[in-house]
Amino acid sequence: MVLLSAGNLSISQSVREILQIEELREIGENGQPGPPITIWNAKSMFDAARVLGSAVRHVYDRDAEALKHAGLDFNVSFIFGGQVRGEGMRLFLVYSAGNFIEATTETPYFQVGESKYGKPVLDRVLTPETPLDEAAKCALVSMDSTMKSNLSVGLPLDLVVYEANKLQTDRVIC
């Protein structure tokens, strides 16, 4: 699983820490609570995204009022992707409210943070059939375009290249 963030760094870091211990509890058919679902035991990426959304809401409940009094918005978004054994690759965009959407063949990628300058590069080149190495190059060109067009965007950049069904990655570019 890979987690990328944009927005308020302190919120992102808090969510990341809460995510380590966050649990979802569902009521089973017998009316009793089932076993907790965590980021570590989720049986699907959808369930893992639900746990992430719950962690975002947990931090919101804890910090939003104090941020508001300081004149700050609760501003965070995440790209969350990966693969759970037995399931295909999945990619989610998680919003500040903890709700999320999933990538589709019509929307095969997500961006967080400043996107208007680099997005046209991606829209013109990427398709679901784009080879992985070409897609990685395209992502780097998109990020470079954004950095050159907007002075508030800068290093560091992180890029993870993951091949479906490997259940590991050996290419992390920073």
Model region roles, listed by residue range:
Residues M1-C174:
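N-terminal nucleophile
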